[in-house]
Design a protein with these regions (language model features):
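Peri-membrane helix termini and adjoining interfacial loops of integral membrane proteins
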Residues: 40-52, 126-139, 229-235, 276-285
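Glycine/proline-centered hinge or cleavage motifs at structural transition points of membrane proteins
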Residues: 188-190, 202
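A short amphipathic helical element positioned immediately N-terminal to and/or at the very start
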Residues: 48-57, 331-332
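Helix-turn-helix DNA-binding elements, focusing on the entry/boundary residues of the two helices
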Residues: 181
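Membrane-water interface segments at the C-terminal ends of transmembrane alpha-helices
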Residues: 9-45, 59-175, 203-223, 251-270, ...
Length: 332
């Protein structure tokens, strides 16, 4: 009995020791972030980076910021629409090829975004095979397609490359956590369109937001596509400060600004979700909402919704890169 006051302390110590490896792993993972934050600490040359940052803030930094924001908005909206539409199609409907599309829609993840950018640019640019053939075949002159290496082109490349993040998480949410609620809505007489709009999509919002967050973080951290397309974003500014200006401290400070922007976006989305109590947790029951069989034009539409992302994100880039082999196998 005389040791009873120490029992809670011993139990707490035991719990802390049991989680010590997790704490150590978390500390190791935080080291890169702490290193970036250390760039703001005063040092021997503490005044050196300030004029550089002030000069960038007065000249190029606002343009970098706006371009980055527009890129993030375009990629976020596009990936959400493309990924959610594909997830709804393969989860709630049954049409020819549905089983194949369930895994085909993941193939763009195997294609790096910068490789997709190279493939589209080579095929669609002014001197590319498509415009060259069109000018020769129809007697046309000048540029026939918008410039691929632009902000809009970058948005397209990122959307078709990163939408699987949204698709994968949204499909899991629709298949595992919302089936019983969709079945309940059906038994109450709600039509299919209302069940999708009022039940499936709102409940899948946390999963869609998580997928969009993953796509945005990869977009903001990308340098290959933005550099190749000549788009001035925060990532290109960081690389320029590090390599062209040979100033690692300014690059680290710019990196913390980009990290703060990402955290702000995540916080805003988390706050908006906290005000809405719609997230379903767990399966909640054994009811299963079977996919609705589609025939005719509805089946064609559902198949098109799934086929277009696969074609743009994987089939077309691979075909563009394999095109030289069809003309000359000696390149192997």
């Amino acid at each position: 009995m005389q040791f009873s006051p120490f029992i809670p302390i011993l139990l707490t110590l035991r719990t802390a020791l049991r989680h010590l490896p997790l704490f150590a792993l978390a500390g190791v993972l935080c080291l890169p972030v702490l290193a970036l934050l250390g760039a703001w600490l005063p040092g021997v040359d503490s005044n050196a980076p300030l004029p550089v940052l002030k000069a960038m803030a007065q000249t190029v930094l606002p343009g970098y910021l706006w371009t980055t924001l527009w890129l993030a908005i375009g990629v976020g909206v596009g990936a959400a629409l493309l990924g959610t539409a594909a997830a709804v199609a393969v989860t709630l409907f049954d049409f020819p090829g549905r089983r194949s599309f369930e895994w085909l829609l993941l193939l763009p993840l195997a294609m790096p975004a910068y490789v997709t950018a190279y493939a589209y640019t080579d095929f669609l640019q002014f001197s590319g095979p498509l415009q060259t053939w069109a000018r020769a075949a129809f007697g046309l002159e000048g540029r026939l397609l918008p410039e691929v290496r632009s902000l809009g082109g970058a948005v397209l490349v990122f959307v078709v490359s990163l939408y699987p993040y949204v698709y994968l998480l949204a499909r899991a949410a629709l298949a595992e956590r919302i089936a019983h609620l969709m079945e309940a809505a059906r038994m109450l007489g709600a039509p299919l369109a209302r069940r999708i709009a009022a039940v499936a999509l709102p409940l899948a919002r946390p999963a869609v937001a998580a997928g969009v967050a993953l796509a945005l973080m990869e977009t903001l951290a990308d340098f290959g596509v933005t550099s190749y397309f000549g788009i001035q974003t925060f990532s290109t500014a960081i690389i320029k400060a590090w390599l062209a200006m040979d100033d690692g401290r300014v690059a680290a400070q710019l990196s913390t600004m980009l990290l703060a922007l990402v955290l702000l976006l995540l916080w805003l989305e988390r706050r908006s979700q906290s005000r809405l109590r719609f997230s379903a947790r767990g399966a909640g029951g054994a009811a299963v909402s079977l996919p609705r069989a589609l025939t005719g034009w509805p089946a064609v539409l559902a198949g098109t919704v799934c086929a277009v992302p696969v074609f743009l994100g994987f089939v077309a880039p691979v075909a563009f890169m394999l095109r030289p082999l069809a003309a000359d196998w000696s390149v192997l």
